Amino acid sequence: MRKPVIAGNWKMHMTCAQARAWIGTFLPLIAELPNDRHLVVAPPFTAISTLAELSEGTRLELSSQNVHWEGEGAYTAEISPSMLKEHNVQYAIVGHSEPRKYFSESDEQINHRARSAQTNGLIPIVCVGESDEQRSRGEAERVIRRQVEQGLEGLDPSQLVVAYEPIWAIGTGKTCEASEANRICGLIRSWVGSPDLIIQYGGSVKPGNIDQLMGMSDIDGVLVGGASLDPEGFGRIANYVKS
């Protein structure tokens, strides 16, 4: 049985003081969280130790927003798996569309990051998705399949999460129709050939659409951006009820 993963990606938001205030509001909202789901937050690196301390003994798990493929070395601005594990981080987001866009990350680099995470006991959340232009040209499936096949090469599908995030739906307020998101997630599952693969949807997820998304047969969780910054809104998302 696939256990859904509800994850919030804070991106470059939240100081340590803001993270403390956030978790003070959020933790009471998940006091009765059902046991049939994982709950994860990916804060900026500076707030990881703060959240690790304040979330100890709760249902909240931690993710990094990236991870390097080397254990140490002259890699300015990067972070290693061992540095993350020291703070009880369990997941690592790799391949998000923003580093793909702004830092020209390739599928090969993303695969190196994901392999490093998995080898060192972290669960990679590998992001894939097409741009608006690629979708309008009918290239969405080809682009996503390439990202999946190259990004997941050599990985154990039972120890990773794939996040389908159509780029045109990230931070735009546009949400992919639940049925279409479900169709793409089903294709990803068939390409990987693993019925137990956890596949999230990401892209303008909010309290108003979470129940419908989680009612889809091939969507096993969500990767939430802006809506995860509001503790009450993210609490509602965490406590979804399938529609």
Curated annotation (Swiss-Prot):
Subcellular localization, as worded in the UniProt entry: Cytoplasm
Residues of the active site: H96 (electrophile), E165 (proton acceptor)
Single biological process term from Gene Ontology: gluconeogenesis
CC terms in the record's Gene Ontology section: cytosol
Pathway: Carbohydrate biosynthesis; gluconeogenesis; Carbohydrate degradation; glycolysis; D-glyceraldehyde 3-phosphate from glycerone phosphate: step 1/1
Keywords recorded for this protein, A-Z: Cytoplasm, Gluconeogenesis, Glycolysis, Isomerase
Gene Ontology terms, MF aspect: triose-phosphate isomerase activity
CDD domains for the chain: TIM (cd00311)
Reactions performed catalytically: D-glyceraldehyde 3-phosphate = dihydroxyacetone phosphate
Keyword GTP-binding: no
UniProt EC number: 5.3.1.1
Annotated residues for binding of substrate: N9, W10, K11, G171, S204, G225, G226
Domain of life (superkingdom): Bacteria
Cytoplasm found in the keyword field: yes
PROSITE patterns, alphabetized: TIM_1 (PS00171), TIM_2 (PS51440)
Subunit structure of this chain's protein: Homodimer.
Family (UniProt): Belongs to the triosephosphate isomerase family.
Purpose of the protein: Involved in the gluconeogenesis. Catalyzes stereospecifically the conversion of dihydroxyacetone phosphate (DHAP) to D-glyceraldehyde-3-phosphate (G3P).
Family annotation (HAMAP family): TIM_B
Protein name: Triosephosphate isomerase
Organism: Synechococcus sp. (strain CC9311)
